[in-house]
UniProtKB/Swiss-Prot annotation:
This is Periviscerokinin-2 type 1. GO terms for cellular component: extracellular region. GO terms for biological process: neuropeptide signaling pathway. Pfam families: Periviscerokin. Mediates visceral muscle contractile activity (myotropic activity). It comes from Celatoblatta sp. (strain Blue Mountains) (Cockroach).
Length: 12
């Protein structure tokens, strides 16, 4: 999860 992909790869 990075700032550019929070929606596609959220840090859960």
């Amino acid at each position: 999860g990075s700032a550019s992909g929070l929606i596609s790869m959220p840090r859960v």
